[in-house]
Regions:
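Flexible loop and strand-edge segments within Gram-negative outer membrane beta-barrel domains
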Residues: 33-73, 77-80, 91-163, 169-180
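Short N-terminal signal/transit or membrane-insertion segments
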Residues: 2-7, 142-143, 184
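Enriched - but not universal
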Residues: 12, 24, 45-46, 157, ...
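Short, intrinsically disordered, charge-balanced linker/junction segments flanking boundaries
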Residues: 191-195
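Alpha-helical support elements that line or immediately flank enzyme active sites
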Residues: 61, 184, 188-189
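N-terminal, post-signal-peptide soluble/periplasmic segments
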Residues: 1-34, 110-127
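Short glycine-enriched, charge-decorated loop/helix-capping segments at active-site entrances
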Residues: 85-90
């Protein structure tokens, strides 16, 4: 602090430290997993393009007596965070849905018809427990600590800032499962002969 108060900014960081960093950059001896010269672009390490997939298969047909329609579908909304499934839990955010529908229509007689409709969906949503991720990615220091040290321990964010990669991979997650099903049966009798 005294050096800063005296306006000796060139003495804030020792020349040997400046030279060491300069040499590290000149030789490429730095990076997100370098113990001595960490240089982490937290956004590039943690964020990737997201994706969404949707697939559907439909069949239909029939005769004068019976008509049918069946549909099955799958939707997968992937994660924008570059996370991998862990041994004990899955830190990735995603939503997966399976849906189905089946309609059967029968002409029992010229005036009587029967319809049976069945539909449903099953959903799986996985949410990461990490909070305020964007702010923490932007606020994390780029050269205070690596993502992980060479001994396998996470870069220490307790004194020099926050390690968002560690947080996203260790805070846990919750898997929500949902199921909804519908069915209806309709019998229709025309009563035109009464009028």
């Amino acid at each position: 602090e005294a050096v800063a108060n005296d306006n000796n900014w060139n003495q804030q960081i020792k020349q040997s430290v400046i030279n060491a960093w300069s040499n590290a950059f000149d030789t490429g001896n730095y990076g997100p997993y370098n113990d001595v010269f960490p240089q982490v672009d937290w956004w590039d390490e943690l964020v990737k393009p997201g994706f969404s997939q949707q697939y559907n298969v439909n069949i239909s047909g029939g005769t004068n007596f019976m008509r049918y329609f069946a549909s099955i579908g799958y939707q997968n909304d992937g994660d924008i965070y570059d996370l991998q499934k862990q041994e004990n839990f899955d830190p990735r955010n995603y939503y997966r849905r399976y849906n189905w529908r089946s309609n059967l229509d029968f002409n029992l007689t010229k005036t009587t018809s029967l319809s049976v409709n069945i539909a449903g969906k099953m959903g799986y949503r996985n949410d990461n427990f990490a909070d305020d991720v964007y702010t923490r990615i932007i606020a994390a220091p780029t050269n205070s600590f690596p993502i992980k040290y060479s001994d396998g321990y996470w870069g220490d964010g307790s004194t020099a800032g926050y390690n968002p990669v560690c947080n996203m991979n260790t805070n846990g997650s919750q898997l929500y499962k949902t199921f909804q099903g519908w069915y209806d049966v309709r019998l229709e009798q025309k009563l035109d002969f009464l009028t």
